[in-house]
Amino acid sequence: MASPNRTIRRKEITELARQTWLRIWSEQMPKDWRVYLVRKTVIQRAHGRSVCGVLLRRDKRILVGRHTKHYSFQTLVHELAHLRTLNEPVDHGPIWDYQFNRVARPLLGSELQTDI
């Protein structure tokens, strides 16, 4: 039987996430979180067809789907904004909207439209 890491074919991109976080918010990303680039089907089987990235609170892990119709760097930043607003009770609430659309998006601009 293939190892779970092999079947998921994940690629750790935590360092890229940490560098991006530091550029946006000028503080350290929480140390115990890991970020992985995975096949989109891994995410979509568990969370629905329209989901490209997911934040797994219990595992302290962020999964970003590759080969989706959305740019993977934008999905990464989208999920980092969720991590930044972890205590907000609403999924895409006003604090998340501010962090993603008013802080991260203007700073990164067209760089968001790239693939990892």
How does the language model describe each region?
Residues 1-74, 83-116:
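Active-site-proximal or metal-binding-adjacent scaffold patches in catalytic folds
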Residues 79:
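Walker B catalytic acidic pair
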